[in-house]
Regions:
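Intrinsically disordered, low-complexity, positively biased terminal segments
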Residues: 1-20, 24-40, 44-47, 66, ...
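N-terminal, Lys/Arg-enriched amphipathic/low-complexity engagement segments
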Residues: 45-49, 53-63, 76-78, 88, ...
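Glycine-rich phosphate/pyrophosphate-binding loop shared by adenosine-nucleotide-utilizing enzymes
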Residues: 70-76, 94, 232-237
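PAS-family sensory domains and close relatives that share small-molecule sensor folds
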Residues: 82-83
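Conserved acetyl-CoA-binding loop-helix of GNAT-fold acetyltransferases
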Residues: 96-101, 107-120, 261-277
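Conserved active-site alpha-helix within GNAT-family acetyltransferase domains
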Residues: 124-128, 133-153, 296-315
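Flexible glycine-/small-residue-enriched beta->alpha junction loops
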Residues: 146-170
Length: 451
């Protein structure tokens, strides 16, 4: 037992023996909105995690709140550690997942109590960033801000784009991915992630986990397919959800090797998705009405090669950075590369940022980040704050309300976009604006977390 929470409830670590009970709990409590039945794929995924199939998660990375008298689970969450990249720099991340509480126990602080423990675990592991894919607003209560993009790719009705006729000759074809494809896939995936600010690297071991490690029916399992030429030469790969998703055949990945047109394999992929969606309809998944690329993300080279006209609104991932100075120090190499490529190359000076409660100070010498450090805010400055130029160095150069500075640092919004959305996002000088724009431009990210 980690804590006695009172009221007949205790907080403890999960164990492998909890696999079946927690699988049933998560499938029931984390079902889709207004769904009449549990969402079984979340139960399968939970069982995979607690039975040791995941490459980094162990059962005692989970928390359970249970009734001390009956052992009935009433609340739970898990921590899945992994390594992501920010501008090519590795960063340790703790992803919080499968957060659920029985309705009769909600509003009693059980999630907050678990976060206190989980955040401590994550910090001890050296995780500088925590993320959650979660319901709207809720996790803002625990120090999280929506600051990484999620989804937003196009969709089209089956009648809008007609696929090639069955049996029509095509210059590319789709086949299952095999283990011997993985060196090619790793190289192509690494290349594709250069388009992105924040991404999740995978070596051959982790790609093999994605290919073979998930139990069929798991909510995190994808169907992975290779694209190849008529002569059998590898041309790229795709991924898709192995079921109809809101009536859609849902593409998640589309990558082609350098030197090939992004448009070239699309007719074969379109035909494959149409046939696959029909097979899912025939097995009882429901109506097959459209093909969607929401999970491919808001920005992708395919969208410049194939004309799509309709999109679902993107969502976002929550992010938490408890020690911003440490995080900025870790991503220092990426910041220095950006500065070197900007009009402020070789810059020397200081940038101070504030969220009106705390601050951080970045010092640069000849373009090198030398001193990222917490920067306590002065409480005795003279007069009101209007964000105007000042001779008082205790006034921060950039002020972002609340946790919106995470949107800036993680490339979710540019400084101009933040100022448009938040009137109290203030920049004191032109030099500060130029430096922030050089260090923290808006940049695309695509998060396929290791789950």
């Amino acid at each position: 037992m980690l804590r006695d929470l009172g009221g007949g409830l205790i907080l403890r670590r999960a164990t492998g023996a909890d696999a079946e009970a927690l699988a049933a709990f998560n499938a029931d409590q984390i079902r889709f909105q207004d769904a009449p039945a549990p969402f079984v794929p979340l139960g399968v995924w939970t069982r995979d995690l607690l039975e040791g199939r995941h490459p980094t998660f162990t059962p005692d990375d989970g928390l359970i709140v249970e009734e001390s008298g009956t052992g009935v689970i009433v609340s739970s969450m898990l921590l899945v550690s992994q390594t992501w990249e920010y501008g090519g720099t590795p960063v340790r991340v703790g992803q919080v997942e499968l957060v659920g509480t029985r309705p009769e126990y909600r509003g009693r602080g059980l999630v907050r109590a678990q976060f206190e423990v989980l955040h401590e675990w994550s910090a001890r592991r050296g995780d500088l960033l925590q993320v959650i894919s979660g319901i709207p607003w809720f996790y803002r209560q625990f120090g999280y801000e929506m600051a990484l993009p999620r989804g937003g790719g196009p969709r089209f009705a089956r009648t809008d784009l007609v696929p090639p006729a069955p049996g029509a000759p095509l210059p590319f074809r789709v086949r299952p991915m095999r283990a011997d494809d993985l060196p090619f896939v790793v190289e192509l995936d690494d290349r594709s992630r250069r388009r992105l600010l924040v991404s999740v690297p995978r070596d051959e071991k982790l790609w093999r986990y994605e290919l073979e490690g998930h139990t069929p029916g798991s909510g995190t399992r994808l169907e992975l397919r290779m694209l190849e030429t008529e002569g059998g030469e590898r041309a790229g790969f795709i991924g898709h959800i192995p079921a109809l998703w809101a009536g859609s055949a849902a593409l998640t990945h589309y990558e082609v090797r350098p030197g090939l047109s992004w448009r070239g394999p699309w007719p074969a992929v379109h035909a494959y998705l149409t046939a696959t969606g029909e097979s899912y309809r025939a097995r009882g998944d429901g109506a097959f009405t459209q093909i969607q690329l929401w999970h491919v993300g808001l920005e992708h080279p395919l969208y410049d090669a194939v004309r799509f006209t309709d999109r679902w609104r993107p969502f976002a991932l929550y992010a938490r950075i408890a020690d911003l100075a440490a995080f900025l120090g870790k991503i220092g190499p990426a910041l220095e590369r950006r500065l070197a490529a900007s009009p402020l190359a070789g810059h020397s000076g200081v940038l101070t940022l504030s969220n009106y409660r705390e601050g951080v100070r970045l010092a640069f010498a000849d373009g090198r980040l030398t001193e990222p450090a917490p920067w306590p805010l002065a409480r005795d400055v003279v007069g009101q704050e209007f964000g105007q130029p000042s001779s008082d160095p205790r006034r921060p150069m950039v002020m972002c309300p609340g946790l919106t500075w995470l949107q800036l640092i993680l490339g979710y919004r540019s400084l101009d976009q933040l100022q448009e959305a938040f009137p109290d996002c203030l920049v004191r000088t032109g030099e500060a604006r130029a430096l922030v724009n050089a260090l923290f431009p808006r940049a695309p990210s695509d998060i396929w977390a290791l789950l």
